[in-house]
């Protein structure tokens, strides 16, 4: 199976490209969508609460993470960002591996990975084309 990576900055057309690819019958793994789902999981919410609740006021209300507050906080603090990524990224990679596994057993010839930070942390290495 050929793995093609979609990457680019905000507003570069990744989402539009992914929609077109999906409309052609191909499967696309959306890293951002996966991260959003992970942030809604109760285990993840509890871990984030332990990590950041004392640092960020009103971070979690009604068992939901205020992702705007979390993002504003961690993107200005590299150490906290690394801590959050160490929680989220392994879960995303697990979902990505399952996506690729499902595609391979269904004999798909091509799979697409929509990964905004493709060139960070060697994410590009698992792609045949970018």
Feature map (PLM): residue ranges:
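P-loop (Walker A) phosphate-binding loop of NTP-binding proteins
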Residues: 9, 21
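Post-Walker A helix-loop "phosphate-sensing" segment adjacent to the P-loop in P-loop NTPases
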Residues: 22-31
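ATP-binding Walker
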Residues: 12
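Walker A/P-loop
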Residues: 15
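ATP-dependent NMP and nucleoside kinases share a basic, alpha-helical "lid"
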Residues: 97-105, 109-130
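ATP-dependent small-molecule kinase phosphotransfer cores
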Residues: 36-108
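Hydrophobic anchor at the beta1->P-loop junction of P-loop NTPases
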Residues: 4-6
């Amino acid at each position: 199976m050929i793995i093609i990576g979609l990457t680019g900055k905000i507003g570069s057309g990744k989402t539009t490209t992914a929609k077109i690819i999906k409309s052609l019958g191909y499967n696309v793994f959306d890293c951002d969508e996966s991260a959003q789902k992970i942030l809604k999981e109760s285990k993840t919410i509890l871990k984030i609460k332990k990590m950041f609740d004392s640092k960020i006021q009103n971070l979690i209300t009604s068992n939901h993470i205020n992702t705007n507050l979390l993002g504003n906080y961690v993107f200005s603090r590299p150490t906290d960002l690394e801590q959050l990524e160490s929680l989220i990224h392994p879960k995303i990679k697990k979902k990505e591996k399952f996506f690729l596994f499902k595609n391979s057993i269904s004999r798909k010839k091509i799979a697409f990975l929509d990964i905004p930070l493709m060139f960070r942390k060697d994410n590009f290495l698992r792609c045949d084309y970018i």
